[in-house]
Amino acid sequence: MTQLTCFKAYDIRGELGEELNEDIAYRIGRAYGEFLKPGKIVVGGDVRLTSESLNVALARGLMDAGTDVLDIGLSGTEEIYFATFHLGVDGGIEVTASHNPMNYNGMKLVRENAKPISGDTGLRDIQRLAEENQFPPVDPARRGTLRQISVLKEYVD
């Protein structure tokens, strides 16, 4: 079992490479999907150069766990919170490292109604599953879908 040091008390943040990469992003998505079993969630990412590739890997993990993914594309954390609540989906994940240096990236996770997921509300469980990396085989009949959407007009209004 690999210890993932990118898991912090309230979110996920790590230096790109060994602490956070596409494989780890996939495992986080898969763990989120297997633990919370959401039907549909929204994802997005900030302007960092690595956010898009991490978001793609994250979405793949979610879909492999049977979760339908709505990708709002370039976004801020507050837009993920808005979209999660506005669309009435089961959760959301923003790929962002906030104020950390450019060689870092991370994720902020929420449940339904945009309730933040932190150490005492599910983040440790997601971490454990991602570290164990012992997921069931992907069932093609159960695999989730990916759809690109925009909530920018509704968010701005």
Swiss-Prot record:
EC number from the UniProt entry: 5.4.2.8
Keywords: Capsule biogenesis/degradation, Isomerase, Lipopolysaccharide biosynthesis, Magnesium, Metal-binding, Phosphoprotein
Active site per the UniProt annotation: S98 (phosphoserine intermediate)
Pfam families: PGM_PMM_I (PF02878)
GO MF assignments: magnesium ion binding; phosphomannomutase activity
Disulfide bond annotation, renumbered to this chain: none
InterPro entries: A-D-PHexomutase_a/b/a-I, A-D-PHexomutase_a/b/a-I/II/III, A-D-PHexomutase_CS
PROSITE patterns: PGM_PMM
Pathway annotation: Nucleotide-sugar biosynthesis; GDP-alpha-D-mannose biosynthesis; alpha-D-mannose 1-phosphate from D-fructose 6-phosphate: step 2/2; Capsule biogenesis; capsule polysaccharide biosynthesis
Cofactor(s) required, per the database record: Mg(2+)
Binding site for Mg(2+): S98
Organism domain of life: Bacteria
Reaction equations catalysed: alpha-D-mannose 1-phosphate = D-mannose 6-phosphate
GO biological process, one term: lipopolysaccharide biosynthetic process
Record has Magnesium as a keyword: yes
Family to which this protein belongs: Belongs to the phosphohexose mutase family.
PANTHER family (UniProt xref): PHOSPHOMANNOMUTASE
The protein, known as: Phosphomannomutase
Organism: Klebsiella pneumoniae
Lineage: Bacteria, Pseudomonadati, Pseudomonadota, Gammaproteobacteria, Enterobacterales
